[in-house]
A protein has these predicted regions:
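Acidic-enriched, low-complexity/disordered segments with a strong bias for Aspartate over Glutamate
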Residues: 13-16, 46, 57, 72
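Residue-level signal for secondary-structure boundary sites
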Residues: 16, 60-62, 96
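Generic structural motif
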Residues: 11-13, 59, 93
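Glycine-rich beta-strand-turn "strand-cap" elements at beta-sheet edges
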Residues: 2, 39-48, 76-97
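Short, well-ordered beta-strand segments in beta-rich or mixed alpha/beta enzyme
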Residues: 2-9, 39-66
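An amphipathic, aromatic/His-enriched active-site/gating alpha helix that lines ligand/cofactor pockets
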Residues: 24-36, 55-89
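Short, surface-exposed ligand-recognition loops at beta-strand->loop->(often short) alpha-helix junctions
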Residues: 9-21
Length: 97
């Protein structure tokens, strides 16, 4: 399993509307094949920055979502709030303890 980590910079004074749009659009991500859950958190220091965290089977599962109609609907619901393009990276399994 991998973790998608996306920093989302939202335009000034658009946080409440963005949060409502994300809540409504979550089923689009969570119904995607290979998705094991998603959450969005707001940054404490700068409330215009949000962190999207999604658990995927693989990077390929995330890429398949990005090529799907579900993603187009997610994008239509959320991307117009962004002040800058999202910064998306993927993280591997946790290090052994």
């Amino acid at each position: 399993m991998i973790i998608e980590h996306a920093l989302l910079r939202v335009g000034e004074d658009r946080g409440d509307a963005f949060a409502a749009a994300v809540r409504a659009a979550f089923p689009l991500i969570e119904s995607a094949p290979g998705c094991h859950g998603a959450e969005v958190r707001v940054q404490h220091e700068d409330p215009s920055i949000y962190l999207l965290i999604v658990q995927w089977d693989s990077v390929q599962a995330h890429q398949a979502f990005r090529a799907s109609a579900l993603y187009e609907r997610w994008r239509a619901a959320t991307h117009h709030f962004y002040a800058a393009p999202p910064e998306v990276t993927h993280f591997l399994a946790p290090l052994a303890r």
